[in-house]
């Protein structure tokens, strides 16, 4: 099933049609396309699903023909958050497509793990075990397989997980709660131990994230400092996920390490772009916007695009906007 094969005439809702046109138009500013995407994501993720859910999923998938790796990777992420099997064929196709950008394929594989359906195991295992695939694809599929197996296991039912402040479906759940108070040094040790499975290390990562939110939690700064050490990990995939978590947390203690990651020209593009977007979510802190503007002409396209989106997000933060999204009014939607 081709992501571009959906028929726009099937999409009757004028709001979805308008958002789809913005999202798929290469002449629209990137920030506006991202806002359209997040509006569609809201509709695609509604639980229980409504009559707008499937058209919204199809509208998101229609933009996989874009040349923008940044946009396509965000499409995949959004589809992975839908909890809807209608997203599976689009994501499976992108994950397998070796012509697609590696960052986009990685995000599609991660999204299949987030959806948690066992139908995806065959594809993910094949990619994980294919030595011709880039390391980031193999590592992503390794984590995604473990997540799906965990999602469908009896062991999961026995685990007690801390209630998270975050509604995102993550590549791994946090470590299960124990009778004793969580020890940040112990969790940090798991986070940084490269001999352990990536899935377990990701569980430590998300456990630390949850100990860092809200930012005035007594454990928050120490948890952020522990996470920051992960930005020195040998795995680019791991480093990029640390930056993503920092974007969720919006904790000022992460600004120095994010700035260092973005400024490092030898760092992987997927890490630098995630650092840029994370800084965008911290845009109301002094000096952050100035830092981002330095990279508007970066040699790497995905970094330039991320800075554009990050500055757009920072502008929304400054203006006190409730949600980073595009809401067409009735007149525009009907146009």
From Swiss-Prot:
Amino acids binding Fe cation 2: 240-241, 273-274
HEAT-like PBS-type repeats, residue ranges: 71-97, 104-130, 200-233, 238-264, 271-298
Subcellular locations according to the entry: Cytoplasm; Nucleus
Catalytic activities: [eIF5A protein]-deoxyhypusine + AH2 + O2 = [eIF5A protein]-hypusine + A + H2O
Family note: Belongs to the deoxyhypusine hydroxylase family.
Protein name: Deoxyhypusine hydroxylase
Pathway(s) per entry: Protein modification; eIF5A hypusination
InterPro entries: ARM-like, ARM-type_fold, Deoxyhypusine_hydroxylase, HEAT_type_2, PBS_lyase_HEAT
Segments forming a coiled coil: none
């Amino acid at each position: 099933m081709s992501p571009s094969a959906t028929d726009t005439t099937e999409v009757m809702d004028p709001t979805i049609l308008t958002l789809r046109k913005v999202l798929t138009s290469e002449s629209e500013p990137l920030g506006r396309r991202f806002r359209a995407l997040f509006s569609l994501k809201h509709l695609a993720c509604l639980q229980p699903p409504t009559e707008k859910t499937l058209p919204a999923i199809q509208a998101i998938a229609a933009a996989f023909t874009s040349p923008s790796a940044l946009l396509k990777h965000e499409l995949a992420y959004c589809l992975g958050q839908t909890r809807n099997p209608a997203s599976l064929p689009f994501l499976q196709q992108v994950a397998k497509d070796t012509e697609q950008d590696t960052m986009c394929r990685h995000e599609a594989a991660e999204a299949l793990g987030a959806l948690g359906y066992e139908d995806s195991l065959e594809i993910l295992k094949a990619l994980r075990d294919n030595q011709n695939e880039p390391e980031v694809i193999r590592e992503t599929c390794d984590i995604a397989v473990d997540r799906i197996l965990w999602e469908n296991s009896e062991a999961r039912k026995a685990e007690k997980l801390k209630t998270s402040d975050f509604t995102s479906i993550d590549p791994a759940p946090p470590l299960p709660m124990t009778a004793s108070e969580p020890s940040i040094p112990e969790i940090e040790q798991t986070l940084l131990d490269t001999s352990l499975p990536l899935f377990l290390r990701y569980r430590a990562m998300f456990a630390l994230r949850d100990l860092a939110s809200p930012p005035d939690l007594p454990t928050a700064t120490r948890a952020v400092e522990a996470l920051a050490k992960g930005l020195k990990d040998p795995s680019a995939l791991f480093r990029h996920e640390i930056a993503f978590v920092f974007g969720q947390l919006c904790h000022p203690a992460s600004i120095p390490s994010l700035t260092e990651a973005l400024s490092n020209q030898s760092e992987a593009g997927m890490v630098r772009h995630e650092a840029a977007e994370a800084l965008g979510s911290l845009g109301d802190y002094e000096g952050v916007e100035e830092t981002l503007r330095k990279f508007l002409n970066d040699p790497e396209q995905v970094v330039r695009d991320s800075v554009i989106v990050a500055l757009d997000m920072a502008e929304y933060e400054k203006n006190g906007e409730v949600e980073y999204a595009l809401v067409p009014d009735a007149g525009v939607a009907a146009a």
